[in-house]
Amino acid sequence: MQVISADQAAALIRDEWTITIAGFAQCCGPESILEAMERRFESTGHPRDLSLIFGSACGDSVSQGLNRLARPGLVKQGIGNQWTCAPRLGDLAADHAVRLETWPLSVIGGWYQSLAEGRSQVLSEAGLGTFIDPQAQDPVAASDPHRPQVMRQSGLDRPTLSYRSEPVRAALLRGTRSDPHGNITMEREVGLQDQLAQAQAVRSCGGVVIVQVLEITHHDALDPRAVHLPAHLVDYVVRADPTLHGQTYGVSYSPTLSGEWHGAAGFPSGPQQDGPSHSEGLDEVWRVITRRAALEVLEATQASDRRRPLLLHAGAGLPEQVPRELHQGHRYNDPRFIWTLESGVVGGMPIGGSSSGASADPTTFLQASVPLRRGGGRGVDMALLGFGAIDRQGRVDVAHPNEAFLGVGSLIDTAPQADRLVLLGTFSTGGHPRFVDRVTRLCLDAVRGASDERPLVITELGVFRLDRGELILIEVAPGVDVQADIVARSGCPIRTIDAPRPMPAQVFGHKAIDWPFVT
């Protein structure tokens, strides 16, 4: 192992390399190295034409993280699960300056593992029948025919998709401490992500592994149980500028996010608690949706007679706000349910906002792709996921036709395995209804692709049931005219029952709810 500066690390990256980068959503990546790469490109024009591999692109949604690499000429293409927090990459893709592919998160984790094992492909059912599938029968589902990396395999017991592996030349990772040999600990990190698999994949390809850390010790006294990346996988270590090594883009350091300290009194407060919206009106709309979703969690908890706690999955964005409503002002860890996140964090309270992907007081950290892999354990009891659009046949897209597409997130992985599926979203966006005649891309067929045959759809105007592809209004918000405000404004047919019940009164207003099951 060799200790180098961030500028030296940036100089190691050559033109046209394929590199994989750590970080997850608002959980920081190797920011010192990314900042040095940005400066080097500005001054020299190199490296050029990079190919990026990532899970959920790290970034602050403005200028940090992978947004730093979103420069014409610097990046040529990328494969990732989503780039919501690196919208500059999405802007380049919209301008056809960069080619971005989105894969299920479970596949990306398996992709790293296949490279580490010397295999040339990943076989997975994730993505079958969606727009990722090149042989999907539905034209809405058909993938880009110019993507040769995904093919359908039909000669096995059941159809699968083959995701082709390609050599990766460098991994840019991060940890907390390194000893003189390059053993890396992660005790102050907010998750493990897929960093071990990334390092193994690059090592198998003969590439270089560069790890940014906060501290380099001068003794061999690291606790072996704390070492996540062993020295034989690490080529270079960079001591980070502390201002470029925050835990998340909203929190420089909080021991509750890394699990070093437990207790609700230590929850971080401040900007990182902000929701994804920035207007007071939209915040109120989101509050109605998340509170109504919280009641679904309450109902499932009260109805459960299992000896083990319910396993709940909160997707990124709006669903991450639901736990805050449940726990606000109360004991935050009810023993009857456990939250999981796409980032691999299990337990505790998801923070969301500018700490999206992190939880306060987590129970454990898994690799990001592990909770979503099929066959690696049971599915979740309930998944709360965001949606962008739903059409007349019950097909779901993660983005509205008028919104930028920023990757599939966990919908493709999670919905087919969840016992109960709850979809959250505003009724409209920019004046356009989210219920449309035809989605742009099929991310989920609620009729055939969801484990829950009758998913719930929650908006601020009403609650709907998806039954055999038909949207049925079952609850309506106070003051809403069903015909004028919902049916007439919808872009697809909505069936209304004779007397839809009113949405619960407690989901409206600003008063904290005294959830009866929290004692």
Tell where the protein language model's regions lie, with residue ranges:
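N-terminal glycine-/serine-/threonine-rich phosphate-binding loop
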Residues: 1-45, 51, 255-311, 329-330, ...
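Conserved phosphate- and dinucleotide-binding cores of soluble alpha/beta proteins
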Residues: 2-11, 25-42, 53, 59-70, ...
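Anionic-ligand anchoring segments at beta-strand to alpha-helix junctions in alpha/beta enzyme folds, i.e.
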Residues: 125-126, 313, 321-362
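Short, hydrophobic/aromatic alpha-helical segments in well-folded domains
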Residues: 197-198, 292, 296, 321-322
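Glycine-rich beta-strand-to-loop/alpha-helix junction loops that act as flexible
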Residues: 20-29, 54-56, 313-321, 343
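Amphipathic repeat-derived elements
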Residues: 71, 289-299, 342, 351-352, ...
